[in-house]
């Protein structure tokens, strides 16, 4: 029985699913010698492109006289799926006390995105000189690993036995508080149990909290347990205390049915009473860790993001030959369709190993019979609608425009259902190998709203997300209904979506913003949607692929 005045300590806000901390381990092979007598003293400097400039993030240690170094110092960086995060790795010779690359110390560099590294787990690239030529046979290998444990939860169940009685006319009303010791040796309250009334042998309710909250993900961090007799005046009577660590708690309950117990000690009684043993015992009956998988767990476990594009070719876009058309192909300024394709697709392509993307159009009359189609391949190859990289999608879009007649209506359900078919097949495998993301670029209100709602509700049960970017100045109020932010979307028959899989964004909100802002907004929800889907299906990530460089360890610096 719990007392309403004894509230549980609230959990701190959960870490944003889109953000994870990644450690990069770096090694090089075959670095150039700057002179014939000595080998280089290499160091790797990591830079991140942020706010239109390259900024140093981390650097490795310096290794002496080594042309194939394996650095021990990891390069840590925050990872965001929705951002491009371009990286540069500069290798330089620090033999003469150099602290940065120069024309005399530069050994080579390479550039890639953080998304490319985490999606492949291990990347090996040639080092390039400042003139763009390869630095001999020099290579750099980068291995990514997510900082683990930050999302895990632990479930604990405690009871006590023969606690001291602190009440004159009844039994104690015990509750327990758990504290973790901070780096400055101060104690921080992390949990308070409910009060069990009039009971010297209380069994407290099981509770669940994050490993980060309990011990800051440090299993050796000291934990302090204090047991009190509740008093409505707020002056609770101290019964006793004990200390432990999460490691000790795990080891003490490792086997089925195994429990761990501690004497509950009141230091004042211990120091004053010769025959004092304890003020009761506290028993840990259950200690289980619940692994909460992250987006990076799935990506590093081999899950590919399958990206599909659908482009609105209805007449409301305007004649492409007119400068006022939303499909105008001006040599001076890319139209909004092209801008959205480049920014959103440019990020998604880093997570697809073959870099081939199906691209469809809807709402146009297409050759040879010029009948209206709502899911035609923009490369006009219905057997193989895939384009090579996002640049191939853009090239197909440019070639497609002069060959079709913009028409209507704006029917979106057919393309959603088309992408749902392979997602349905993927679901049947029961594995986390491919998650589909459909990008719909449209200029107006959906004509087949009822069918679209039905298609989205069906897709919400599949490994699939839908991003809708509204292009132009139309009234998109109906489109926001699909987003599900104001409550679960329902199909016309009243069946609710299993989860929120649609993100709608009007392009005009980002017209004057940096190109990356649009991608940041529309892709921010994808990591959460991926994790939610696989968690709802009870599907764990695949085993991380082997990532340790098979290289001889470098000599100590």
Curated annotation (Swiss-Prot):
Its taxonomic path starts at: Eukaryota, Metazoa, Chordata, Craniata, Vertebrata
Q: Which InterPro entries match?
A: C2_dom, C2_domain_sf, C2B_Copine, Copine, Copine_C, VWF_A, vWFA_dom_sf
Instruction: Please describe what this protein does.
Output: Calcium-dependent phospholipid-binding protein that plays a role in calcium-mediated intracellular processes. Binds phospholipid membranes in a calcium-dependent manner. Plays a role in dendrite formation by melanocytes.
Annotated organism of origin:
Mus musculus
Q: What is the effect of changing residue 274 to A?
A: Does not inhibit calcium-dependent translocation to the cell membrane
Outcome of swapping residue 283 to S? Inhibits calcium-dependent translocation to the cell membrane
How is expression of this protein distributed across tissues? Expressed in the brain. Expressed in pyramidal cells, granule cells, and neurons in the dentate gyrus of the hippocampus and in granule cells of the olfactory bulb (at protein level). Expressed in pyramidal cells of the CA1-CA3 regions, in granule cells of the dentate gyrus, in granule cells of the olfactory bulbs, in the mitral cell layer and in neurons of the cerebral cortex layer II, brainstem and spinal cord. Not detected in glial cells.
Which SMART domains does this chain map to? C2, VWA
Effect listed in the UniProt record for changing residue 33 to N: Does not inhibit calcium-dependent translocation to the cell membrane
- What is this protein called in UniProt? Copine-6
Q: Residue ranges of region Linker region?
A: 244-303
Task: List this protein's GO terms for biological process.
Answer: cell differentiation; cellular response to calcium ion; positive regulation of dendrite extension; postsynaptic actin cytoskeleton organization
- Which regions form coiled coils? none
Q: What is the effect of changing residue 284 to S?
A: Inhibits calcium-dependent translocation to the cell membrane
């Amino acid at each position: 029985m719990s007392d309403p005045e004894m509230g549980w300590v609230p959990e701190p806000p959960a870490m944003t699913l889109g953000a994870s901390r990644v450690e990069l381990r770096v090694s090089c092979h075959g670095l150039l010698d700057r002179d014939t007598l000595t080998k280089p003293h290499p160091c790797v400097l990591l830079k991140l492109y942020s706010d239109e400039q390259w900024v140093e993030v981390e650097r490795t240690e310096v290794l002496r006289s080594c042309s194939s170094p394996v650095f021990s110092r990891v390069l840590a960086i925050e990872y965001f799926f929705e951002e491009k995060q371009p990286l540069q790795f500069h290798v330089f010779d620090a033999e003469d006390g150099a602290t940065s690359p120069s024309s005399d110390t530069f050994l080579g560099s390479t550039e890639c995105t953080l998304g490319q590294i985490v999606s492949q787990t291990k990347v090996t690239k040639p080092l390039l000189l400042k003139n763009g030529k390869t630095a001999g046979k020099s290579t750099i290998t980068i291995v990514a690993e997510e900082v683990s444990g930050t999302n895990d939860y632990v479930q604990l169940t405690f009871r006590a036995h023969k606690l001291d009685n602190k009440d004159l006319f009844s039994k104690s009303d015990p509750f327990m508080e758990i504290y973790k010791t901070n780096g400055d040796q101060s104690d921080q309250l992390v949990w308070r149990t409910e009060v069990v009334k009039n009971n010297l042998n209380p069994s407290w309710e099981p509770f669940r909290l994050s490993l980060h909250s309990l011990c800051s993900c440090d299993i050796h961090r000291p934990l302090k347990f204090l047991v009190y007799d509740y008093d409505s005046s707020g002056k609770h009577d101290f019964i006793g205390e004990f200390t432990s660590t999460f490691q000790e708690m795990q080891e003490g309950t490792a086997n089925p049915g195994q429990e761990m117990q501690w004497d509950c000690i009141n230091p004042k009684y211990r120091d004053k009473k010769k025959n004092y043993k304890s003020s009761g015992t506290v028993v840990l009956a259950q200690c289980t860790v619940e692994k909460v998988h992250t987006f990076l767990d799935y990506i590093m476990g081999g899950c590919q993001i399958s990206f599909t594009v659908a482009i609105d070719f209805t007449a409301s876009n305007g004649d492409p030959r007119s400068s006022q058309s939303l499909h105008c192909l001006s040599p001076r300024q890319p139209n909004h369709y092209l801008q959205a394709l480049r920014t959103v697709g440019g990020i998604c392509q880093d997570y697809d190993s073959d870099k081939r993307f199906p691209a469809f159009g809807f709402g146009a009359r297409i050759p040879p019979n010029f009948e209206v189609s709502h899911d035609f391949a923009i490369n006009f190859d219905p057997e193989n609608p895939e384009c090579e990289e996002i640049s191939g999608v853009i090239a197909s879009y440019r070639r497609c425009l002069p060959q079709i007649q913009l028409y209507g209506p704006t029917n979106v359900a057919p393309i959603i259902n088309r992408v749902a078919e392979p997602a349905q097949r993927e679901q049947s495998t029961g594995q986390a190998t491919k998650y589909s993301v459909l990008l719909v670029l449209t200029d107006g209100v959906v004509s087949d709203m009822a069918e679209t709602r039905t298609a989205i509700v069906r897709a919400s049960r599949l490994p699939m997300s839908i991003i809708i970017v509204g292009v132009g100045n139309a009234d998109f109020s109906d489109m926001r209904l699909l987003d599900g932010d104001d409550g679960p979307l329902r199909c016309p028959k009243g069946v609710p979506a299993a989860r929120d899989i649609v993100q709608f964004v009007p392009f005009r909100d980002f017209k004057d913003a940096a190109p990356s802002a649009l991608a940041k907004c529309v892709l921010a929800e994808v990591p959460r949607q991926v994790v939610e889907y696989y968690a709802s299906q009870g599907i764990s990530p695949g085993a991380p692929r082997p990532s340790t460089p098979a290289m001889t360890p470098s000599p100590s610096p």
